[in-house]
Amino acid sequence: MRTPTHDEFSGRLDSLNGDRSNVFGPELGEFSNADRRADELGDKETKTGTTTVGIKTEEGVVLATDMRASMGYMVSSKDVQKVEEIHPTGALTIAGSVSAAQSLISSLRAEVRLYEARRGEDMSMQALSTLVGNFLRSGGFYVVQPILGGVDETGPHIYSIDPAGSILEEEYTVTGSGSQYALGVLEQEFEDGLSIEEAKGVATKAIRSAVERDLASGNGINIAVVTEDGVDIQRHQNFEGLE
């Protein structure tokens, strides 16, 4: 896979770093000011708090998130879309810094288009997960912990990617501040052979469990279904009729 360091698209970010580091060149080193920026912002930065869930089925994948954003102890938004299409058959959930997540999503969309235009072929989910991991390892997207879900010619895939860039392919996974509550539901409810509709019900139950206990999660649910036909994202202000 092409390493995302090409200057035609990526450009140089000398003015941001004071050196030759580049957000699209994770193999060249990390941002020198990433830790300082995090310390300076602290609770002033808008964060998604969040509970996000990913489940793989034989037909595709289901991604679900809550809809609350927080700033310190304040709810800064009750209507945040925390799952976005980044590939014709791939979507990404976000947990962590809102600004970093928005930048990451925009960068991934652009790199996917560039990759496919240059090569004349679809980017595989393995290649896309590597791209996400490389971006996070660069230190330029502090702190984001996404779940990547998608379908390619080898089938459905769910990847858990931590803020340091490590990548784990899973049958199901969770991220965010409410993850311990959601994980308990998944451990109990997940089984091989779930249909898309059954997986949506399990994901909804997991998110609902988290929002009832986690102060940083709440205000509805986003559900994305990814199949070989594309990405369908639906927003619900409450949980009625979803389980």
Swiss-Prot record:
Does the keyword field hold Hydrolase? yes
One MF term from GO for this chain?
threonine-type endopeptidase activity
UniProt keyword annotations, A-Z: Autocatalytic cleavage, Cytoplasm, Hydrolase, Phosphoprotein, Protease, Proteasome, Threonine protease, Zymogen
Q: What are the boundaries of the region Disordered?
A: 1-50
Matches recorded under InterPro entries? Ntn_hydrolases_N, Pept_T1A_Psome_bsu_arc, Pept_T1A_subB, Proteasome_sua/b, Proteasome_suB-type
Give me the Gene Ontology terms describing cellular component. cytoplasm; proteasome core complex, beta-subunit complex
Q: Please give the residues making up the propeptide in this record.
A: 1-49
Q: Where found in the cell?
A: Cytoplasm
The entry describes the temperature dependence as follows:
Optimum temperature is 75 degrees Celsius for the Suc-LLVY-Amc hydrolyzing activity (with the alpha1-beta proteasome subtype).
* pH relationship of activity: Optimum pH is 7.0-9.3 for the Suc-LLVY-Amc hydrolyzing activity (with the alpha1-beta proteasome subtype).
Induction (record text): Up-regulated at the mRNA level during transition from exponential to stationary phase. However, at the protein level, PsmB is expressed at a high and relatively constant level throughout growth.
Q: Per the entry, what modulates this protein's activity? A: The formation of the proteasomal ATPase PAN-20S proteasome complex, via the docking of the C-termini of PAN into the intersubunit pockets in the alpha-rings, triggers opening of the gate for substrate entry. Interconversion between the open-gate and close-gate conformations leads to a dynamic regulation of the 20S proteasome proteolysis activity. In vitro, the chymotrypsin-like activity of the alpha1-beta proteasome is potently inhibited by carbobenzoxyl-leucinyl-leucinyl-leucinal-H (MG132) and significantly by N-acetyl-leucinyl-leucinyl-norleucinal-H (calpain inhibitor I).
What CDD domains does the entry give? proteasome_beta_archeal
Q: What class of enzyme is it?
A: hydrolase
Catalytic residues identified in the record: 50
Task: Extract the Pfam families matched here.
Answer: Proteasome (PF00227)
Which Gene3D superfamilies does its entry note? Glutamine Phosphoribosylpyrophosphate, subunit 1, domain 1 (3.60.20.10)
Q: What else is known?
A: H.volcanii proteasome requires high concentrations of salt, similar to the extracellular environment and cytoplasm of this organism, for complex stability and optimal activity.
Q: How does it assemble?
A: The 20S proteasome core is composed of 14 alpha and 14 beta subunits that assemble into four stacked heptameric rings, resulting in a barrel-shaped structure. The two inner rings, each composed of seven catalytic beta subunits, are sandwiched by two outer rings, each composed of seven alpha subunits. H.volcanii produces at least 2 types of 20S proteasomes: an alpha1-beta proteasome and a proteasome containing all three subunits (alpha1, alpha2, and beta) that appears to be asymmetrical with homo-oligomeric alpha1 and alpha2 rings positioned on separate ends.
> What does the similarity note say?
Belongs to the peptidase T1B family.
The record describes the protein's role as: Component of the proteasome core, a large protease complex with broad specificity involved in protein degradation. The H.volcanii alpha1-beta proteasome is able to cleave oligopeptides after Phe, Tyr and Trp, poorly after Glu but not after Arg. Thus, displays chymotrypsin-like activity, low caspase-like activity but no trypsin-like activity.
Check the record and name the NCBIfam families matching this protein.
arc_protsome_B
Official protein name in the record: Proteasome subunit beta
What is the species of this protein?
Answer: Haloferax volcanii (strain ATCC 29605 / DSM 3757 / JCM 8879 / NBRC 14742 / NCIMB 2012 / VKM B-1768 / DS2) (Halobacterium volcanii)
